[in-house]
Amino acid sequence: MIRAIVTDIEGTTSDIRFVHNVLFPYARENLPSFIIGNQQQPAVAQALDQLRAEVERPEATVQELIDVLFGFMDEDRKSTALKALQGMVWRDGYLNGSFTGHLYPDVLPALRRWQQQGLALYVYSSGSVAAQKLLFGYSDAGDITGLFSGYFDTHMGAKREVDAYRNIASQIGLPAEQLLFLSDIHEELDAARDAGWHTVQLIRGAADNASRHRQVTDFDRINQELLNS
C-alpha cells in the first residue's frame, strides 16, 4: 500500500514552459549582477567555492565562474552549485512579483485529497530545495508548502540514478514498496522502479512510446486503486 508520494516538478506539477521560458531566462539575465553584488554573502560564496571544486579550478575568479555558469546553462547541466545560485536569483523574482510559480489546475486538488487520505507528500527535483520551496510558496494558488513533508534535490543523487531513490527512501523512513514517484521522464522512473518504488508517468504533451510505466494525463487519473496497490 502506498504511504507516501514523491513528485517531480518540471513537466509534472508545473508546465515545462514556465521553467524554460520564465525561470531560466530570468536567471540568465540576472545571475551575473547578482553574483558580483553578493559574492561576499556566505551562501553565494559557498556556492562559488562548490563550483570551483566541481570544475577543479580552485583559483578561478568570479568572472571566470560566471562564464562557467553560462556554459552550464547552455548545456542544461544539473550542477548543484548552479541550481543553488539560480534559486537565489529566482527568490528575488518571486519576492518582487516578476512571476509566480505555475501549477497545473489538477495538481492542488489532488495534493489536498491525498494529504487528507493520510499520504505523506514530498518533492524531488533537480532544482535546489530552496527553489522548490519558492515555486510552491509563491505559486499561482498561493503558498502550498504546508502540503509537503519534505523536499529533495540532487544532494540525494542524480534523478536517473538508482541510489538517489534509495537515499530518499532512507530519508523518508519507509520501504520502497510503499513509495510512489511521479515524473514525466521515463528514465527517472526507470531508476525509481529499479530501487523498488511504484511509478506513474505524467504525460502532459506528446506520448512517450518508449516508456514501460503506467501513464496518466493528469493527477486526477491517479486513482485509489493504484494508491491501494
Swiss-Prot record:
It is an enzyme of class 3 (hydrolase). Its EC number is 3.1.3.77. GO terms for molecular function: 2,3-diketo-5-methylthiopentyl-1-phosphate enolase activity; 2-hydroxy-3-keto-5-methylthiopentenyl-1-phosphate phosphatase activity; acireductone synthase activity; magnesium ion binding. It comes from the Bacteria. GO terms for biological process: L-methionine salvage from methylthioadenosine. Binds 1 Mg(2+) ion per subunit. It catalyses: 5-methylsulfanyl-2,3-dioxopentyl phosphate + H2O = 1,2-dihydroxy-5-(methylsulfanyl)pent-1-en-3-one + phosphate. Gene3D superfamilies: 1.10.720.60, HAD superfamily/HAD-like. Pathway: Amino-acid biosynthesis; L-methionine biosynthesis via salvage pathway; L-methionine from S-methyl-5-thio-alpha-D-ribose 1-phosphate: step 3/6; Amino-acid biosynthesis; L-methionine biosynthesis via salvage pathway; L-methionine from S-methyl-5-thio-alpha-D-ribose 1-phosphate: step 4/6. SUPFAM superfamilies: HAD-like (SSF56784). Keywords: Amino-acid biosynthesis, Hydrolase, Magnesium, Metal-binding, Methionine biosynthesis. Its cofactor is Mg(2+). Pfam families: Hydrolase. NCBIfam families: enolase-ppase, HAD-SF-IA-v1. Bifunctional enzyme that catalyzes the enolization of 2,3-diketo-5-methylthiopentyl-1-phosphate (DK-MTP-1-P) into the intermediate 2-hydroxy-3-keto-5-methylthiopentenyl-1-phosphate (HK-MTPenyl-1-P), which is then dephosphorylated to form the acireductone 1,2-dihydroxy-3-keto-5-methylthiopentene (DHK-MTPene). Belongs to the HAD-like hydrolase superfamily. MasA/MtnC family. Monomer. This is Enolase-phosphatase E1. The gene is mtnC.
